[in-house]
Amino acid sequence: MNFDMSKLMQQAQKMQEQMKKAQQERENMEVIGESGAGLVTVTMTGKYDVKSVSIDNSLMSEDKEILEDLIAAAVNSAVKKVEENSTASSDIYKMAKDAGIDLPSGINFPFK
């Protein structure tokens, strides 16, 4: 079995480019988290920056604690969506396979 260092380096570079692209896509994405059947919505970027919060006028007469809970739930919903989309777009095994690298299953990487 011949070991081709230049081929390995090309594969590693391709994988690095794919990971960089996935990171850029994540940073540019926006998700919307909601609570109270859509009465509270939070728009968040892939960098976890909250861009906007929308509260339906019908909630303005609600108790302060209820409103705080709904806002927290909407933020948590948005965070969960960012994480779900990040995991899907940066699957290390898929990137490695696309780069022609066969990784053994069961490796626990310190990142996603």
UniProtKB/Swiss-Prot annotation:
One GO CC annotation: bacterial nucleoid
UniProt GO molecular function: DNA binding
Keyword check for Cytoplasm: yes
Region Disordered, annotated ranges: 1-27
Disulfide bonds: none
Keywords in alphabetical order: Cytoplasm, DNA-binding
Name of a matching Pfam family: YbaB_DNA_bd
Places the protein is found: Cytoplasm, Nucleoid
Main subcellular location of this protein, as a coarse class: cytoplasm
Biased composition (Basic and acidic residues): 17-27
Family: Belongs to the YbaB/EbfC family.
Quaternary structure and interacting proteins, as annotated: Homodimer.
PANTHER family the record matches: NUCLEOID-ASSOCIATED PROTEIN YBAB
Function: Binds to DNA and alters its conformation. May be involved in regulation of gene expression, nucleoid organization and DNA protection.
Protein name: Nucleoid-associated protein FTT_0810c
Annotated source species: Francisella tularensis subsp. tularensis (strain SCHU S4 / Schu 4)
